[in-house]
Amino acid sequence: MTTDTIVAQATAPGRGGVGIIRVSGKLASDVAHTLLGHLPKPRYADFCDFKAADGSVIDQGIALFFKGPNSFTGEDVLELQGHGGQVVMDMLIRAVLKVKGVRIARPGEFSEQAFMNDKLDLTQAEAIADLIDATSEQAAKSALHSLQGEFSTQVHTLVDKITNLRLYVEAAIDFPDEEVDFLSDGKIAAALYAIIDQLDEVQASAKQGSIIREGMKVVIAGRPNAGKSSLLNALAGKESAIVTDIAGTTRDVLREHIHLDGMPLHIIDTAGLRDTTDEVERIGIERAWSEIASADRVLFMVDGTDTAAVDPHEIWPDFIDRLPKAMGVTVVRNKADLTGEPLEATEEQGYSVYRISAKTGLGVDALKQHLKSLMGYQSNLEGGFIARRRHLEALEQASEHLQLGKVQLEVYLAGELLAEELRMAQQALSEITGEFTSDDLLGKIFSSFCIGK
């Protein structure tokens, strides 16, 4: 951990009513004496002049001093809140750097110091960047929940339960004559199943939090001339794709990035799926299947004039059978303006079914609301936390180890192997909060932050 004293502008560069310079480290008090002529009373606002080394006044404003460990970074912190002109900010930073031993902060270094000094765990530190980068009110609220420790608390609860179970199993190993009875009495199995169920719930919430942060990938798929490109245009609100009556017009993947009430949505229009001898169209169809395989949701576009069926297994069983097992599918019956069917949403055989006219826009707003709900949009903004892809990967690793541990318990009654799988699951979860994390990962995370944060 560095013992350097660091300085950076904490507010965004450019013109503004207020600009803030932040200093953190053991030399923060020396900086105060140099620029202010005194050390402000800790945690009290002090209106004073900010002076250069020659005594000339650079600016005047509010000085705040926080004595470590009672500060954001856990170190002594000085904040100078002056006028927001960039020239003034640069002059103040140069004056601070004249104090020997002070250097410019790296991106995210203030948050990194807070993490190193146990003021924040890693998910809370990441939540600061996510709160700053939030593109919707929902994302901001979820990031704030993570900053307040909601995600961390759930992870810590799981780690504690896994640790206690592991100790219980290891106690059984220490008494080999009783180990088999100990492992087969049902108590360990019940505790393990409860942990697996709880982890499943956290995984579901984390996946929703990841969608709120990164957006949901929605692929529009179906047979040629079902109206896929028309739906892309309707959702995007512009003519992104060429629309004709000729089957196979779309031969490549088309992408649009839109926001629904600020929530990011990545829409992919694909080539119509069919057998073809046209080489270019065939390549487009292969790309379509590749996009479908990595989608968060598939909009199965159906030409309502071709069939009255609503069950996708009845409409096109081969298509549904080829989809990844856990893929979410929404059936979109298009051309309701021609079929005259009511513009209603129904649930059929576990699938959401929407009736629309991509050409006229009828029913498209209801489909947008459906997509918003899938992304976790909540009008009351209650609950939920933000999550990153690395969090999902760590949760999946923990889940895999718990499932392997379940096999060791149920099939082999192997206490040592169960204990090892529990240890690996515990380690995977601890990577989320930073209790077990490599320096390379820390560097990658904090380097993506703003300077001054």
Curated annotation (Swiss-Prot):
PROSITE patterns attached to this UniProt entry: G_TRME
Cellular-component GO terms for this entry: cytosol
Enzyme Commission number: 3.6.-.-
Localization terms from the record: Cytoplasm
UniProt binding sites for (6S)-5-formyl-5,6,7,8-tetrahydrofolate: 22, 79, 119, 453
Cofactor note: Binds 1 potassium ion per subunit.
Keyword Hydrolase: yes
EC top class named in words: hydrolase
Domain TrmE-type G: 215-376
GO biological process annotation, one example: tRNA wobble uridine modification
Residues the record lists as binding Mg(2+): 229, 250
Major localization listed first in the record, in broad terms: cytoplasm
GO molecular function: GTP binding; GTPase activity; metal ion binding
Residues reported in the UniProt entry to bind K(+): 225, 244, 246, 249
Record flagged with keyword Electron transport: no
SUPFAM superfamilies associated with the record: P-loop containing nucleoside triphosphate hydrolases, TrmE connector domain
Residues noted as binding GTP in the record, renumbered to the chain: 225-230, 244-250, 269-272, 334-337
Cofactor(s) this protein cannot do without: K(+)
Transmembrane intervals: none
Family the UniProt entry places it in: Belongs to the TRAFAC class TrmE-Era-EngA-EngB-Septin-like GTPase superfamily. TrmE GTPase family.
HAMAP family recorded: GTPase_MnmE
Subunit structure: Homodimer. Heterotetramer of two MnmE and two MnmG subunits.
The protein's role, per its UniProt record: Exhibits a very high intrinsic GTPase hydrolysis rate. Involved in the addition of a carboxymethylaminomethyl (cmnm) group at the wobble position (U34) of certain tRNAs, forming tRNA-cmnm(5)s(2)U34.
Name of the protein: tRNA modification GTPase MnmE
Organism: Shewanella amazonensis (strain ATCC BAA-1098 / SB2B)
Underlying gene: mnmE
